[in-house]
């Protein structure tokens, strides 16, 4: 039973408009890791497996709540580079919905690129850019493979803490 599991690590998901929630839950269940989905009041999320935390609507409310809950060794699933940077600073693992791992080696570059893109949008006044392309089965497979590797690594490194 998962409630009896001694492994203290958890998976936290910034679940607002997150296309990989079900994949995360399936793998969390497979590996007996507790999962917490965070969303704001503008999104309705139901789960038979995960704990669901609903945070009041507001800019970055979910992000701040997620960061406050993270403990060293936990996994954070978010498409927000800022959230990922804060997760890494707490000794957590972080992954983007694309399957790309955020690391201490790549996060500064990603934040810089985000800043440059935002600055360019302000200069050109292009605020309504085309959204991401439609998610494919390959995207889901790529995420699933990368996420499972991350879970296995986190479990192996967290076993020492039990």
Predicted segments — roles?
Residues 10-162:
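Nuclease catalytic cores that cleave nucleic-acid phosphodiester bonds
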Residues 1-8:
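Short, Lys/Arg-enriched N-terminal segments with co-localized hydrophobic residues
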């Amino acid at each position: 039973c998962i409630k009896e599991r001694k492994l203290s690590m958890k998976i936290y998901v910034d679940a607002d408009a997150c296309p990989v929630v079900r994949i995360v839950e399936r793998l969390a269940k497979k590996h007996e890791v507790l999962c917490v989905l965070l969303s704001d009041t503008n999104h309705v999320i139901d789960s038979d497996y995960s704990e669901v935390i609903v945070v009041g609507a507001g800019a970055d409310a979910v992000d701040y709540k997620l960061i406050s809950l993270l403990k060293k060794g936990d996994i954070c699933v978010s498409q927000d580079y800022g959230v990922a940077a804060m997760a890494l600073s707490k000794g957590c693992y972080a992954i983007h919905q694309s399957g790309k791992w955020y690391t201490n080696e790549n996060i500064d570059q990603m934040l810089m690129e985000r800043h440059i893109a935002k600055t360019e949008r302000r200069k050109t006044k292009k605020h309504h850019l085309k959204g991401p392309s439609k998610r494919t089965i390959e995207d889901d497979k790529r995420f699933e493979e990368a996420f499972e590797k991350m879970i296995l690594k986190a479990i192996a490194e967290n076993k020492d803490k039990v």
